[in-house]
């Protein structure tokens, strides 16, 4: 079922290109290139922006909010016309938004929100409703386990609005079946490795787990590896969000159960359209 962000050292990982609009510059600070969705989005955004003849500089924050804020400050110093990001943190990214506002520049936030953004006319959010992705997971669980189930919930970054919204959507959908219980919640930080190790520990802690629900596909793919090693892939369902190529292949192979699509290509193309305006 399909319904669905960056690592850096002290130096910027950046690339830029120009095809005719050499005086117009877009800066994009990626959340983390190690997160499958973000890596894919970065590529789509760069291609879609360059296709319009717009110069774009792309950096990788490596999941570090302070690094990302610094990168956006750098874009402003470089006289960028637009700054944009898959913002790392709902509150932690406020300094970057304020810097853009002080410079009179548009701030385009992809996939994730920034607190106070709606109070700035130059703030633009591009992304699908994350609450809907969580809702899709919850609705699937209600259909798959009409008599109830015991599930674990593996989350992403705790103060990232996309994950707050995904949890809200899941919880709302699960109200339809109060017999589906969330045994516990663990932060696996969008990491396949952490998803795997957390699942391994959980298998030792709980006698009965019907499903492990993850807020992104990377964590879910780690869970799949843990269940395969333990011989429990047939008895525990695994749900993700993003619709990554690896997740779709895992579903096709009969491993992951479902994912909710985040359409990176469509969102990137929408961003390029905004840059052009």
Language-model-derived ranges and their functions:
Residues 3-277:
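A residue-level marker of the well-folded mature domains of exported/periplasmic proteins
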